[in-house]
Structure formats: C-alpha cells, structure tokens
C-alpha cells in the first residue's frame, strides 16, 4: 500500500514538472516591449522603418488633427512619462510642450537639423546654434530630405540606448532608410527643378523648405498657421497671383 502511494505521488510530481516545463517553454512571453512615443508622422515613419519589430510605438497627435492646436490629455502625459523615449519636432510646432516638464528620455529633433528663420525674424541678429528661441523658425523642417536624414540619425542614436533593441539590426535598418531617402532626393531633383511654373499657391505655408531647395516661390493664404483667417488684402493679392501666373491648383 505504501509502495502504491509512493508511486502515485512520484507520478503526480513528474506530471507537474512536465506541465510547468511546457508552460514556460510554450507560453508566449508576457514581457512588455519598450514604448516609444512620437508627436508627428515624420518621426513615426522613421521609427517604423528603424525598429518597429522590437518596440511598441505610437503617434501622439492623431491623423488629420491640426498639429499646431493639439493639446495632450492627462492620459497622454502619463504615457509620455512612462515611455522609453518621447520624440517631438520642437521649433514651436508643439506649443503645449513649452512650460511642460519632460523627463530625460526625450528628444527634440529641432536641435539637430537646419532651420529656416521666419521672415518676421530676419531683422533679428541670428546665428546658427543649438539653443534657439522657439517661433523664430519655420518648424516644417522635415520636408527637407537632408533634415530627415539628420532626424533619422538622431533617433537612431537615442534608440541605441534602449537595451532591448538589437543594435546590428537597427544600424542596418538605418542604412536602408538613408538609402531610400537618397533615392527620393534624386527623384525630387530630377522632377521638381524642371517644373514650368515655379509658383506654389497654398492655404497653409508648410513647404518653404522644398521651395528653397528647388527654387519655388510660395504664396500662402494663411501663413504658417493653418487656422489663421486671411485678410481681404491677402485674398486680393492671391487672386492676382493666380491670374498672372496661370495657377491651376491651390
């Protein structure tokens, strides 16, 4: 009887060990991936191409929402504080950031790119440097492909600090991404410089970097702010430009 009980107990223990072993080896990992939060799509695109498999990442400002007027919710701020990295454009594009406490794990991309001084700031003494006053610069710098390359480098260097990310894979993805940007730059040079009409009439002036690179002239209805109301004088001027230069599309 005692031998029978011992055999039964031994069998139960063996089954328990086998069960635990398979639970550990066959169950999917419940470890959470490090989270990276970005403010706009240009950063989202870079992160997606560099290491989307190894991290959880999301764009803070929803598609279709005006970047300039966006305000984060308390839930958004909690997510930012808990993230492994928060990336934002800077240069005044996200006004809510000014005066907001941000943890050390943040990256202001405007500090590593070439910025255009706004026309109304041109009469101020200005020097290219890393610490600048916001709102003196056009914040739409990612439309310059060279700036996208600089942004990709800065983001890659920050991602390398996250221990869960495979460094060699990240470096290779970065090189692939830079190659694709160079190819896009060549296409731009081949097509945009040969445009017959160099006048761009826009509702919202977000294309000054492209205009500078490829010799376009920008005529903007609402300036840098997409929700600004144009004056009657501006509308008359735009109408004259459209007629004079045979602009077919605004």
Spans of model-derived segments:
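N-terminal secretory signal peptides that target proteins for export/translocation
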Residues: 1-3
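Extracytoplasmic metal-acquisition and chelation regions
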Residues: 5-9, 13-16, 21-249
């Amino acid at each position: 009887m005692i031998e029978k009980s011992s055999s039964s107990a031994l069998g139960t223990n063996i089954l328990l060990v086998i069960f635990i072993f398979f639970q550990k080896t066959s169950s999917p990992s419940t470890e959470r991936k490090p989270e990276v939060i970005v403010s706009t799509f240009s950063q989202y695109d870079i992160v997606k191409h560099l290491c989307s498999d190894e991290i959880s990442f999301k764009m803070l400002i929803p598609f279709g929402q005006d970047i300039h007027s966006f305000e984060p919710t308390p839930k958004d701020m909690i997510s930012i504080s808990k993230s492994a990295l928060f990336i934002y454009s800077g240069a005044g594009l996200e006004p809510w950031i000014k005066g907001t406490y941000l943890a050390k794990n943040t990256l202001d991309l405007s500090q590593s790119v070439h910025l255009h001084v706004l026309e109304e700031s041109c009469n101020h003494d200005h020097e290219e440097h890393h610490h600048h006053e916001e709102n003196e610069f056009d914040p739409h710098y990612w439309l310059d492909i060279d700036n996208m390359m600089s942004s990709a480098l800065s983001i890659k260097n920050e991602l390398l600090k996250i221990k869960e990310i495979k460094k060699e894979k990240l470096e290779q993805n970065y090189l692939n991404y830079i190659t694709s940007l160079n190819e896009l730059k060549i296409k731009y040079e081949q097509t945009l410089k040969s445009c017959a009409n160099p006048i761009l009439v826009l509702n919202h002036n977000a294309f000054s970097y492209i205009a500078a690179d490829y010799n376009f002239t920008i005529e903007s209805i609402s300036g840098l702010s997409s929700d600004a109301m144009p004056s009657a004088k501006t509308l008359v001027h735009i109408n004259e430009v459209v007629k004079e230069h045979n602009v077919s599309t605004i």
